Amino acid sequence: MTGTGKTVTRVDLCEAVYQKVGLSRTESSAFVELVLKEITDCLEKGETVKLSSFGSFMVRQKGQRIGRNPKTGTEVPISPRRVMVFKPSAILKQRINGQANGSMSNSDQAETD
């Protein structure tokens, strides 16, 4: 990984909204919290949240399966559960990989179909 290692927090997002949109700090914080709550509420209901040019958050159901304790080797049942997954858009993948817009490889195009 060649990232900077910085973790962006809610406070960082609120500050970015404050700096770039021009809302007060209180309004910026309320705005960020509202957006995050709406995304959370949708996911909790099992809805997919698709953000154009960014990606999709979705909830998937995982069935029961047998796992193994790595220390003892004992089989352990893993209960069925719901997990949240994020699938980045092709545009986000390109930006992360430093590619210019519109220069998708064949493998990237196959993933978006």
From Swiss-Prot:
Alphabetized SUPFAM superfamilies for the sequence: IHF-like DNA-binding proteins
Cross-referenced HAMAP family: IHF_alpha
Matches recorded under Pfam families: Bac_DNA_binding
Single Gene Ontology BP annotation: DNA recombination
Family from the record: Belongs to the bacterial histone-like protein family.
Alphabetic keyword roster: DNA recombination, DNA-binding, Transcription, Transcription regulation, Translation regulation
Descriptive protein name: Integration host factor subunit alpha
Keyword Transcription (UniProt): yes
Matching InterPro entries: Hist_DNA-bd, Histone-like_DNA-bd_CS, IHF-like_DNA-bd_dom_sf, IHF_alpha
Single GO MF annotation: structural constituent of chromatin
CDD domains linked: IHF_A
GO cellular component: cytosol
Quaternary structure annotation from Swiss-Prot or TrEMBL: Heterodimer of an alpha and a beta chain.
Keyword Cytoplasm in record: no
Domain of life: Bacteria
Function of the molecule: This protein is one of the two subunits of integration host factor, a specific DNA-binding protein that functions in genetic recombination as well as in transcriptional and translational control.
